[in-house]
């Protein structure tokens, strides 16, 4: 009351404060960071280790397992999972939430340094951190009209320019071939002079050096002396001297052909079917996609202005998606404001009343924006959606105050300025306790979110704080802006308001029906039990998912080819996949990037597409399942893609013995293939390929001074070549590679004919020290917490198939060492759902405590709390009706519902308590409902209708918060009925004759 009275007596001061609010609020919008999603730090570190030429089994044995053993006892590590593939080991460490990741990073680096000696010489593990916003910020396609060596041009001219941008963390180039100098050895000549590849590489390296040799005095100067033997032309390499083991000096040209050549550097890259060089750009963790986009586009314009033959196309820009998403949410918010003002007009019939509430909305939003910026939150889909939710909830307080002011005016005899002043002050005072109580109950439910450390806490903490900011701002607006505007505008309630007569008829009907219900309390209680039973029935069998995916209009086609597949077969598989993508009339453009044994097609769909992105992905998946020699997974890319997506059936088998696990997996796949209720059965080890394995005889090898490691290194050099040095020609750095002619060791017989040189210079055939055999090798080997795992997936052709497959196929094949495991997505869902369930339970308790303190009565608190369980029937029913599953956002909707659905009950019980001082209990129960039916309907309708645009999932990111809106719409709709018809009965049942008040001693 004191605040309201001060505001009414100092209007100029208030207006100036509001003006400052507008200025600082708008300023906060321009200074806020714009992002798709809140910046979430994933407590995960990834170890990458490359070992060229090693197969998955060797990688697992020599690299992955030693590292896993060393880091297995590290503090704070929750799960260790690894994938060993051809030439690469990737180990992911999932830490407990709340772990100091900087300290964890340092500890992990120290562990890796300690075991470096236990790893092969060429293996140098690297560690990188991960967060949810670490995807590609931009994708560029580069073409040039005149450059014949485009890869080197991009690598040496364009990439360095982009790397100067401070907001860029990483740049990856794909496609094209690079120029290099080939030192093509002649086998006969090498044998003639008894030389090895390493002899030639060392001679080339020694002939291209510059080293400091000290200092010398020259008069008054002290000059540095440098010894230089630099090769600057390709033809100069031919004259490099090489000393043979016999002491003879020969030239490089005597044993090798020297010429410029090209080789693939970045794999395959095509944009809309045309060969191109593609560049993917990742942002720094503390930067935004908007900053990266602006800086890159500016740099691209500079580069193209300097070179008219250069064309750089922005294939994908994440900032565009962010702006579109935020624009959609902003439009939804504006629509919610319009809906709220229209409802006010319907009930009061006076545009001034709509303006009063309309004035409080921007005031509350601006105060919230200032608070968001000060709290360090970004403007993203989550915080903007919170503002949309806030619009519906923040007008509740204003409506209650406005309706009370109208009622106070009707009771005033003075209709002049003094009368409006008194009505504004008195009307606000009557409901001040109710709006404070309802605001606190709404805000207090978000308190548990502040203590959640998991992904739920990181994602929804900004949403919770934003709604708290909105509700706090709305309370302040209701106590200040609404009374002041009421005094200034002097609105009058129209006698012929559109909802005037319907409300009067509704009040009359309510009095009659409530009079009957109070005579049939047992019937109401029986109906209550039926509602609870229906709630349980609706809740059972609901589909669950971690997070509803948004529709960004991007489809990701992940392609994994069989290891060792010939280049022409790879091209055939890629061409088939490209043909399916390019033939779709939904596609605007697409980018293919392939390297090693895997690649991806990123398809960017048209804005005016007629199909949902998920539907396009499902259609392509069916068409691509028949492409030979590869495994293809098609999915819709979303802002939450790091959470993964499950399509159809999936089971993960865990076992300690790989051979046994593989045998069981093959048997399960065979049995599933024979069934008709599943199709497209795939196994994570199905891309097996035969490899050539050298089984070294340690005794024979030692006799010639050889080891398995030295033999492996020699073969790797002979098959892959040695990078001996680098030349700078015409300003370009060109690698000099010592290699044998292409096809020299293409067949197994060629490899068997290799002659090795022992440490004593003695020659020995490879087959004398090792057996060359064929073995079946998996494309990759996966492990989780030390146990091997194989994933089997399939698509359903019928209903209720999962339980049948588990009972008829999976369970009978399990043994003592093999079990069913959970993937990371399922583990995450279980953990995050548990956290949200606890948060909801704590929120219910806090709401109970707040209301008990507000009413100074546990009894009244219990009465109002009954609205919570009964409102769930509306939430589950609407979820079932719309086909929306239970997800993190829908569970958050239940959390919000706990704090909002009780507001009508609070208003009703507070009014009954006021009326009981002048009325009997029965009359007070009936008249309180009839009197408050209008504000209850107004506040509920504004909240519910303002959420409808969000429930319709309008815009690309609309589906992210759709479940939240549906839960609240259904719950609040039923909550109105509970507050008006069931709470009065509970009040009557729990009411007792009040105890005699103890008089004050004073």
Write out the residue ranges for each language-model feature:
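Signature of alpha-helical transmembrane segments and their immediate interfacial
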Residues: 1-34, 429-431, 452, 484, ...
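Extracytoplasmic/periplasmic membrane-proximal domains and adjacent transmembrane bundles
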Residues: 6, 37, 48-50, 90, ...
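Transmembrane helices with small-residue packing motifs
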Residues: 12, 19-58, 99, 113-122, ...
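Hydrophobic transmembrane alpha-helices and their membrane-interface caps
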Residues: 25-30, 312, 339-347, 351-407, ...
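Flexible hinge/switch segments at interdomain interfaces of large molecular machines
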Residues: 35-45, 81-87, 122-144, 172-178, ...
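Solvent-exposed, membrane-proximal periplasmic/extracellular interface segments of envelope transport
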Residues: 60-130, 189-209, 230, 569-647, ...
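Helix-loop junctions and hydrophobic alpha-helical segments within the transmembrane domains
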Residues: 315, 322, 326, 402, ...
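Transmembrane alpha-helices and their membrane-interface boundaries in multi-pass membrane transporters
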Residues: 391-405, 431-451, 458-497, 601, ...
């Amino acid at each position: 009351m004191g605040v309201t009275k001060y505001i009414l007596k100092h209007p100029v001061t208030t207006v100036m404060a509001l003006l400052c609010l507008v200025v600082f609020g708008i300023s906060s919008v321009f200074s806020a960071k714009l992002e798709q999603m809140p910046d979430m730090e994933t407590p995960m570190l990834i170890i990458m280790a490359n070992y060229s030429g090693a197969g998955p089994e060797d990688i697992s044995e020599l690299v992955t397992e030693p590292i896993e053993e060393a880091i297995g006892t590290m503090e704070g590590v929750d799960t260790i999972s690894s994938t060993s593939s051809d030439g690469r080991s990737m180990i992911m460490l999932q830490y407990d939430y709340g772990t100091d990741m900087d300290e964890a990073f340092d500890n992990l680096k120290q562990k890796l340094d300690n075991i470096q000696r236990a790893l092969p010489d060429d293996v140098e593990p690297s560690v990188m951190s991960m967060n949810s916003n670490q995807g590609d910020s931009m994708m560029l396609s580069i073409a040039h009209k005149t450059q014949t060596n485009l890869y080197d041009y991009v690598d040496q001219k364009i990439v360095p320019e982009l790397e100067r941008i401070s907001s860029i963390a990483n740049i990856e180039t794909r496609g094209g071939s690079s120029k290099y100098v080939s030192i093509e050895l002649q086998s006969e000549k090498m044998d003639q002079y008894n030389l090895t590849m390493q002899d030639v590489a060392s001679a080339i390296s020694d002939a291209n050096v510059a080293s400091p040799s000290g200092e010398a005095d020259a008069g008054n100067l002290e000059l540095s002396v440098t010894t230089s033997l630099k090769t600057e032309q390709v033809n100069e390499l031919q004259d490099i001297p090489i000393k043979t083991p016999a002491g003879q000096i020969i030239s490089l040209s005597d044993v090798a052909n020297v010429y410029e050549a090209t080789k693939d550097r970045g794999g395959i890259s095509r944009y809309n079917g045309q060969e191109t060089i593609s560049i993917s750009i990742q942002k720094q963790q503390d930067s935004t996609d908007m900053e990266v986009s602006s800086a890159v586009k500016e740099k691209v314009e500079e580069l193209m202005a300097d070179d008219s033959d250069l064309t750089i196309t922005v294939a994908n820009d994440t900032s565009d998606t962010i702006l579109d998403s935020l624009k959609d949410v902003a439009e939804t918010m504006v629509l919610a404001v319009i809906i709220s003002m229209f409802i006010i007009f319907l009930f009061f019939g006076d545009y001034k009343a709509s303006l009063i509430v309309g004035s409080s909305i921007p005031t509350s939003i601006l105060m919230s924006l200032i608070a968001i910026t000060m709290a360090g939150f970004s403007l993203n889909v989550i915080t903007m959606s919170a503002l949309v939710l806030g619009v519906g909830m923040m007008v509740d307080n204003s409506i209650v105050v406005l309706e009370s002011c109208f009622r106070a005016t009707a009771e005033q005899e003075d209709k002049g300025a003094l009368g409006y002043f008194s009505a504004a002050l008195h009307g606000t005072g009557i409901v001040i306790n109710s709006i404070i109580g309802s605001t606190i109950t709404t805000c207090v439910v978000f308190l548990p979110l502040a203590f959640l450390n998991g992904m739920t806490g990181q994602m929804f903490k900004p949403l919770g704080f934003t709604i708290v900011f909105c509700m706090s701002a709305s309370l302040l607006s209701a106590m200040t802006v609404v009374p002041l505007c009421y005094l200034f505008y002097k609105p009058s309630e129209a006698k012929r308001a559109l909802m005037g007569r319907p409300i009067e008829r509704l009040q009359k009907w309510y009095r009659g029906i409530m009079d009957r219900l109070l005579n049939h309390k047992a019937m109401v209680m029986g109906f209550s039990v039926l509602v609870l039973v229906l709630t349980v029935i609706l809740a059972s069998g609901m589909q669950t998912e971690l997070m509803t995916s948004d529709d960004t209009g991007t489809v990701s086609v992940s392609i994994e080819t069989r290891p060792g597949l010939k280049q022409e077969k790879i091209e055939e598989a890629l061409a088939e996949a490209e043909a399916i993508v390019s033939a779709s009339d939904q596609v605007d453009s697409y980018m293919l990037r392939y390297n090693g044994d895997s690649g991806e097609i990123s398809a960017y769909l048209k804005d005016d597409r007629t199909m949902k992105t998920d539907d396009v992905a499902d259609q392509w998946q069916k068409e691509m399942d028949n492409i030979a020699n590869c495994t293809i997974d098609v999915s819709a890319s979303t802002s939450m893609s790091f959470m993964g997506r499950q399509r159809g059936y999936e089971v993960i088998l865990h076992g300690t013995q790989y051979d046994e696990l593989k045998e069981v997996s093959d048997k399960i796949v065979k049995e599933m293939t024979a069934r008709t209720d599943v199709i497209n059965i795939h196994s994570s080890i199905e891309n097996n390929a035969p490899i050539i394995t050298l089984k070294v005889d340690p005794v024979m090898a030692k006799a010639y001074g050889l080891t398995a490691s030295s033999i492996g290194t020699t073969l790797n050099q002979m098959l892959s070549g040695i990078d001996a040095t680098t030349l700078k020609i015409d300003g370009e750095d060109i690698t000099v590679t010592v290699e044998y002619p292409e096809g020299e060791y293409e067949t197994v017989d060629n490899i068997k004919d290799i002659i090795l040189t022992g440490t004593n210079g003695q020659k020995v055939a490879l087959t004398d020290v090792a057996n060359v055999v064929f073995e079946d090798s998996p494309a990759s080997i996966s492990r989780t917490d030390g146990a091997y795992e194989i994933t089997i997936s399939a698509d359903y052709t019928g209903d209720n198939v999962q339980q049948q497959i588990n009972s008829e196929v999976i369970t009978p094949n399990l043994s003592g060492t093999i079990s069913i495991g959970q993937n990371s997505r399922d583990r995450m869902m279980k953990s995050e759902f548990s956290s949200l369930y606890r948060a909801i339970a704590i929120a219910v308790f806090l709401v109970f405590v707040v209301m008990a303190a507000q009413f100074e009565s546990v009894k009244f608190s219990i009465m109002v709390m009954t609205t919570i369980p009964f409102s769930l029937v509306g939430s589950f029913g609407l979820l079932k009706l719309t086909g929306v599953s239970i997800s993190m956002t829908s569970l958050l909707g239940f959390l919000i519902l706990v704090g909002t659905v009780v507001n009508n009950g609070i208003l009703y019980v507070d009014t009954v308590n006021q009326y009981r001082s002048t009325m009997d209990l029965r009359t007070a129960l009936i008249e309180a409902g009839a009197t408050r039916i209008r504000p209850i309907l107004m506040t509920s309708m504004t909240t519910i209708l303002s959420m409808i645009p969000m429930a319709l999932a309008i815009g690309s990111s609309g589906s992210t918060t759709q479940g939240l809106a549906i839960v609240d719409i259904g719950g609040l709709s039923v909550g109105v009925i509970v507050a008006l018809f069931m709470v009065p009965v509970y009040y009557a049942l729990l009411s007792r004759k009040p105890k005699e008040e103890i008089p004050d001693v004073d």
